[in-house]
Regions:
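Signal peptide-directed extracytoplasmic domains
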Residues: 63, 67-139, 151-152
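Acidic, glycine-rich low-complexity/disordered segments
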Residues: 132, 140-149, 241-244, 252-285
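N-terminal signal peptide c-region/cleavage motif recognized by signal peptidases
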Residues: 17-19
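Bacterial N-terminal signal peptides that target proteins for export
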Residues: 1-8
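Amphipathic beta-strand/beta-sheet edge segments enriched in Tyr/Trp
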Residues: 25-32, 36, 203-251, 326-330, ...
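N-terminal segment of the mature soluble domain
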Residues: 47-73, 133, 137-144, 148-192, ...
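A short, hydrophobic beta-strand-centered structural micro-motif
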Residues: 81-90, 174-177, 191-222, 310, ...
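C-terminal soluble interaction/assembly domains
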Residues: 239-246, 265, 275-371
Length: 371
């Protein structure tokens, strides 16, 4: 019980200091737009295009410009730009067309996270933080050269397109190693058949929250058609995509995954279930553990404030003031495993040792500041 007094004395300082945010997705508020010249009108058009990309990435919505507040900001994007620079991209040495064409400039822009988030909230749109679940992709493409995996040195052009589209929507993309273990665990044919059991078993070593399984076919007309499985825990979603060119087919699939994830994790400020909830947390061994825990909770986009209301030797009760509902908060807490659920979750009441007036809703164990 000797730890209670210093914890209480340091509480206010901890809440102020606990501002570090662990990001899974870098450059969420940045965009790069090709331009031909450095005029003011060109800058405004490019800044508007870049801002729309950022708004789509941060909101998790594929369409944002239909909101009046967003349309107004896109017409006058300069106030949201905090930094920009022009640079000359190098043309490939083996690209003969680059000799005849005027080389484009690339305008790199950074936008204010605070202003972007405020704009989305004023437009009634959610904000999806940089802490996002990873997605493992097993993709087989059937082209003129046969059916092959995408990745591991195979079909690099398709891998680059997949990376580009994941970056566009802010999805942390993971490709298999395609080492001897993967070769033994999963075949091209099993992926082509969209065998969920085989894919699940082969994917266990990677620990990704989502697994995307796809088979894509290229036709002589340039048309691409693809079938997909999205494995989300025990949930299996199936869908199709197509397009004139591989990029369209892959973009459609990435959009589908991003929409599913954003529905679960993007936070709508002041949502119907917003409020506060008491959670009990054990495994707090010392002051450092306490500081790490409170910093972590304060860093979550869904948490407006995290306030300690009761502290014991190795456990405490925290009042979470939420921007959205507790169900979504539970998804955030489960995403990286720093807080693990313990038995009895969802049963309102006061656990042994906790004052009876504190109606704890969920119970967790703190397992560390990083995993």
């Amino acid at each position: 019980m000797g730890l209670i007094a210093p914890w209480c004395l340091a509480l206010c300082l901890l809440i102020i200091a606990a501002t570090a945010r662990a990001e899974m997705v870098a450059n969420l508020y940045d965009a790069a737009v090709p331009v031909k010249e450095q005029t003011q009108s060109t800058f405004r058009r490019a800044a508007s295009e870049g801002l729309e990309r950022v708004l789509i990435r941060v909101s998790g919505r594929s369409q944002v410009s239909d909101r009046a507040d967003i349309a107004s900001a896109l017409a006058n994007p300069e106030p949201l730009v905090v930094q920009y620079r022009y640079h000359q991209p190098l043309a490939p040495d083996n690209d003969p067309s680059a000799v005849d064409e005027s080389p484009s400039l690339m305008l790199e822009l950074s936008y204010s996270p605070r202003q972007v988030n405020a704009l989305l909230q004023s437009a009634g749109l959610p904000v999806w933080s940089a802490n996002r679940p990873s997605m493992l992709v097993w993709l087989v493409a059937d082209t003129a050269s046969g059916r092959r995996f995408v990745g591991g040195g195979e079909q690099p052009e398709l891998q680059a397109l997949m990376n580009d589209e994941a970056l566009r929507r802010g999805l942390p993309l993971q490709l298999p190693l395609f080492d001897l273990t993967d070769t033994a665990n999963l075949s091209v044919n099993q992926v082509w058949q969209l065998s969920a059991p085989a894919v699940r078993e082969a994917s266990q070593r990677y620990g990704s929250a989502y697994i995307l399984v796809g088979r894509a076919s290229e036709f002589s007309t340039g048309q691409w058609v693809a079938s997909w499985l999205l494995l989300d825990g025990d949930v299996v979603r199936t869908f199709e995509s197509d397009g004139m060119g591989a990029r369209q087919a892959l973009a459609s699939a990435v959009d589908r995954v991003a929409d599913v994830q954003a529905e679960r994790y993007a936070v709508l400020n002041g949502g119907a279930g917003a409020g506060s909830s008491l959670i009990q947390i054990d495994g707090i061994a010392d002051f450092r553990s306490y500081a790490a825990l409170m910093g972590y909770l304060e860093s979550l986009a869904i948490v407006r404030h995290a306030n300690s209301v009761w502290v014991s030797d190795r456990e405490l009760v925290v009042d979470l003031v939420l921007n959205d509902d507790m169900e979504k908060a539970q998804r955030f807490l489960a995403m990286d495993g720093r807080l693990q659920e313990v038995s009895g979750n969802g049963q309102q009441g006061s656990p042994s040792g906790v004052p009876p007036q504190l109606m704890v809703r969920n119970r967790y164990r703190w397992v560390g500041a990083a995993r």
